[in-house]
Design a protein with these regions (language model features):
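A structural motif corresponding to the C-terminal end of an alpha-helix
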Residues: 161-163, 303, 396-405, 522-529
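Active-site diphosphate/adenylate-binding microenvironment
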Residues: 36-40, 44-48, 54-57, 62-64, ...
Length: 588
């Protein structure tokens, strides 16, 4: 796997108290099966190998149970938001279900933005949330979230950021509640189990093997409904692939369908890795605000658009509405898109796309897309100030990354540049969270991805994202994870600086920072962490080579400018409007 986690338990086992109310066997594990044991053992049986969380009094029994399971590791994060994004990244890897655990009170409340991202992006995540004992519901207990007698109602709260939320009050109910929650998560989004401490500690006449672990089977529509329309298309077809293609591991099936249709292929921004090769002549780039202009022109030259595994939200649809209005639109996926279309439902794109391809066998497999030409790029204005340019840095990074590297990108200017200009590794993943678009997501998600896939993971983030959740680098150091953090330090929330400049006449800035030396600071904080600042383009190739060659984590902090405009269509459209109509007042 390229990293090691110390699972030695001998000394800790010897130190465990034999005076636990439940009693302990000679190996230290409590006699009988607690609800906490059943949960952990069940997760292990269905293939979960890591759970992510932050400890606390009302979740510690779950960690205790994990200690005694040799097939599952409980990972300690620094913050519950990042623990949730670790589970999200783990799930996006395709390895298995992402699981996050948090204690009651402020700890569980920190899960909300992470689960919100998973809900909006339809990522399967199971959240195990500790609560005070049921006997104290509504009686003023510390961190009471029972909803009784004026207490915060955790069930109502988490129901808003999940597909399924259930509070367990009877220990035996875990036998039905746990598989129900797992099934809900596997349908595409978070599920939450609220677990009072006394329930977790209760001994039940039940083991994990007594609970059914059958795979969730979800109904799908007959793809024949759209096969006829595709077969009878009078012009060429443009496919826009979404994040469900990656989640369902349907890349090969997508390419076979594309070949059968001789279609052009684009992806939404958070599905760059849905295509086998972004350099294929049939690939026309990324859609939306950080996408490629050629997608809209390809749509207008064809007669039909096929959406696969995407709802095409505004971020992915920007600039396409006019083109979409001129063509027929079909859709396959787990949820209907936000645009008018004929939609067929599928929770398993591998199966559905294979069926669709079989129904569309072409007699002439010759492709009309024979010439290799990269997608047309957006052209931001040239920046002549100090700092390394985004485009230049991405070109060097593109040359340096291993063929199997996974890439996780954060929100912001550096993220827009990476989505627009950095190619997907042939054997790697490319992850960006645009459901909620919260800054700091990449640090936890990169850790989850590294645990899941055990290969070099590259996190690309700005200094603003780092100051929010970058201390999860400590988690990468603690577990020796193979993650290279590439930080673009422009001493600002630079995308917000650009908005101040373009939409508010550059009268002020709330979003510029005093200079910081992130690379040097992390090197001082973690003496064993290779970490450096890079101030010139010439120094970047060697810095990346060294950072990517170490066994564990590393950091490269690149000095860039907050005044450089990223490849982000709304900014470029605003600049173009001002240049063509210089007397028109800026509008937000």
């Amino acid at each position: 796997m390229g990293f090691a986690v110390d699972n030695s338990r001998d000394s800790e086992t010897e130190n465990r108290s034999a005076a636990c109310d439940l009693g302990h066997n000679r190996l230290g594990r409590p006699t009988g099966s607690r609800v906490a044991d059943v949960i952990i053992d069940y997760l292990s049986l269905i293939g979960v190998r890591h759970i992510f969380g932050v400890g606390g009094a009302n979740i510690e029994d779950l960690y205790d149970a994990a200690f005694f399971n040799d097939d599952l590791t409980a990972v300690l994060a620094k913050h519950e938001f990042s623990a949730a994004t670790m589970a999200d990244g783990y799930s996006r890897s395709g390895i298995g279900l992402g699981v996050v655990a948090a204690t009651s009170g402020g700890g569980c409340l920190n899960l909300v933005p992470g689960l919100g991202e998973s809900l909006a992006s339809r990522v399967p995540v199971l959240a195990l949330v500790g609560q005070p004992p049921c006997t104290m519901d509504g009686r003023g207990s510390f961190q009471d979230t029972s909803g009784r007698n004026g207490a915060l109602d955790a069930e109502a709260l988490f129901s808003a950021v999940s597909l399924h939320c259930e509070r367990i009050l009877e220990p035996a109910d875990i036998a039905t509640a746990l598989p129900r929650a797992v099934a809900a998560a596997r349908s595409g989004g978070p599920a939450v189990l609220l677990l009072p401490k006394d329930v977790q500690q209760s001994v039940v006449d039940l083991t994990a093997r007594d609970i059914p672990t059958a795979d969730t089977v979800l109904a799908a529509d007959d793809p024949g409904e759209i096969a006829a329309e595709l077969r009878n298309a009078t012009g060429h077809v443009t496919i826009i692939a979404g994040e469900q293609v990656s989640r369902d591991d349907a890349r090969e099936e997508l390419e076979r369908l594309r070949a059968a249709l001789d279609a052009r292929l684009a992806t939404v921004p958070d599905a760059k890795d849905a295509v086998a090769s972004s350099r294929s002549s049939a690939v026309i780039g990324v859609t939306g605000v950080m996408g490629h202009p050629g997608v809209a022109s390809a749509l207008t030259k064809g007669s039909l658009c096929l959406l696969i595994g995407t709802r095409l939200p505004a971020t992915a649809r920007s600039g396409l509405d006019a083109a979409l209005s001129l063509v027929s639109t079909l859709s396959v996926g787990s949820a209907p898109p936000f645009v008018p279309c004929t939609h067929i439902h599928s929770h398993d794109l591998r199966a559905t796309l294979a069926e669709l391809t079989t129904a569309l066998e072409r007699q002439d497999p010759t492709s009309r897309w024979s010439s290799d030409s990269p997608p047309e790029e957006l052209q931001p204005p040239k920046h002549r100030g100090p700092g390394v340019r985004y485009r230049d840095a991405m070109a060097i990074l593109d040359d340096a990354l291993p063929v199997d590297a996974d890439v996780v990108v954060d929100a912001g200017n550096s993220g827009a540049a990476a989505v627009h200009q950095l190619s997907v590794r042939p054997a790697g993943r490319f992850v960006i969270a645009l459901g909620m678009g919260g800054m700091g997501y990449s640090f936890g998600a990169g850790i989850g991805l590294a645990f899941a896939r055990g290969r070099r993971t590259v996190v690309i983030a700005g200094d603003g994202a780092f100051f929010m959740h970058g201390m999860e680098i400590h988690t990468a150091v603690e577990y020796g994870l193979p993650i290279t953090f590439v930080l673009f330090n422009n001493n600002a929330h630079a995308m917000c600086v650009t908005r101040e400049q373009l939409f508010y006449d550059d009268r002020y800035s709330y979003n510029r920072f005093r200079p910081s030396r992130i690379g040097a600071g992390l090197a001082a904080m973690f003496p064993d962490l290779p970490s450096r600042d890079v101030e010139s383009l010439d120094a970047l190739p060697e810095a990346l080579r060294q950072a990517l060659s170490v066994d564990g984590p590393s950091v490269v902090s690149i000095e860039c400018s907050a005044d450089e405009i990223p490849p982000f269509a709304p900014f470029l459209d605003n600049i173009a409007t001002k240049e063509s109509q210089p007397d028109v007042a800026a509008s937000a």
